[in-house]
Amino acid sequence: MATACIAQSTLQVHGISKPIVARFDQPHASSDGGALLLKAVDERLGLTWRLASALRDRRQPGKVAHPLRDLLRQRVFGLACGYADCNDAARLAHDPIHKLLLDRDPLAGAALGSQPTLSRFENAVGRADLYRLGTALVDTVLSSHRARLGEGARLITIDLDATDDPTHGQQEFAFFNGYYDTWCYLPLLATVTFNTEPIQHVVAGLLRPGTGASTRGVRGLLRRLFTKLRTLFPRARLRVRADAGFADSKLLSFLDRAGVEYVLGLPGNRRLDKRVRRLLGRARMQARTTGETATLYGETRYAARRWDRTRRIIMKAEVLCYPGRARKDNPRFLVTNLPHRPATVYTRLYCGRGDMENRLKELQQGLAMDRTSCSRFLANQLRLLFSVAAYVLFQTLQSVGRASVLGAAQVWTVRERLVKIAVWVERSVRRIVLHLPQAFPWRDAWCALAQTLAGP
């Protein structure tokens, strides 16, 4: 009969008279007791079920030990719990909570998939599978908001942003990017915001090679988003926001033909600098008079050489004043088809786009969006979709608990407070009992969320 080796440590702590003995001797315990909230969210959305349904299993049925849905859920829930590597599978193989997340018996159920199994799964996915996965992800998110809002959506804002994903191996399509001064990928992220709500809901993630136009893949992504949004929310106005890296002639013409609102950053040039010169002079005078930063707004009509028409340009003439430093000019430009006053367009309708940086930070630092270390490009795209799917679970959980102090918290805070809970699992014939710490500081918030998710 095999016996498990029990790890034990003895500590002598100053001020405590007795030695402290720490034993890792609880086989039916886990440190991820709160992850059941994420499973409840997944059941409400049907997210992993839809994603798994988009995959085609080409394996011989009689030899399959781990269904694709289980492997997909193992990766998504693992990322959500902070386990970014496939190598973590060996450490979690017998974790009772992670078995429970896959609908297995937490004590006697089969072990989770191994690292080689997960790696084969990631590298077996093809282009068609990824397209269906991306479509299923968008459909799941938008359908949930259709059920939540009904006909109440009047404005839907689509935010686009990209970032660098440094690579450190021989990954496919990882190229040197001079702007970021590194070998990298350039993942693109898209979010939707409904009406004046503060949450930017992530709906798509697209991995792109390390070089090329910043608008690569944008029109195809937007075309599919426009179609789905107009089907689900026929009365809503669509608005696109993005920084200056996306303001090229083809994308602007595409947005005009699509009949959507847009407000995009625009890089400065000599012609625009001449247009803003007078406004900037007034801002300099105001800054000299008050000794504080001065900001003025104006507008003009402008067409770059490759544009097919003139467009409205919002100009911000700003002079920055900091104690002990020389004053600094900071002119900025936007291109838009919105009719609002220049100051309103810039401060109220465009600046909210900057919160996309937080979405990127959460995905990179909290959900390992940049863990793209597979040799195959398509496998890395799959990993990106897994991170986005895990983020959708967290965003939905935060939407449910918006009234609590956790509603606006970032991913790692929610994970530390709601997911990382020590638990002892007990199973009887009739039920499974999770024994959680009585002194858990976020007990009330956890119970409130669990009760809400258990409701109709």
Model regions and ranges:
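Dynamic "connector" segments at or just before major functional cores
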Residues: 1-213, 217-232, 398, 405, ...
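An anionic, glycine-rich sequence signature occurring as long contiguous blocks
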Residues: 4-24, 261-365, 448-456
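Short, conserved catalytic/metal-binding motifs centered on acidic residues
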Residues: 41, 74-75, 86-89, 114, ...
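Short amphipathic alpha-helical "interface-anchor" segments enriched in bulky aromatics
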Residues: 41, 345-382, 386, 390-397
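Flexible loop/turn segments at secondary-structure boundaries
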Residues: 98-99, 165-167, 211-212, 246-250, ...
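Short, glycine-/Ser/Thr-/acidic-enriched flexible segments
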Residues: 163-165, 208-210, 267-269, 320, ...
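Domain-level cores of phosphate- or acyl-group-handling catalytic modules
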Residues: 212-271
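A glycine-rich phosphate-binding loop feature that marks nucleotide/adenosyl-phosphate handling sites
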Residues: 365-368, 378-381, 403-419, 437
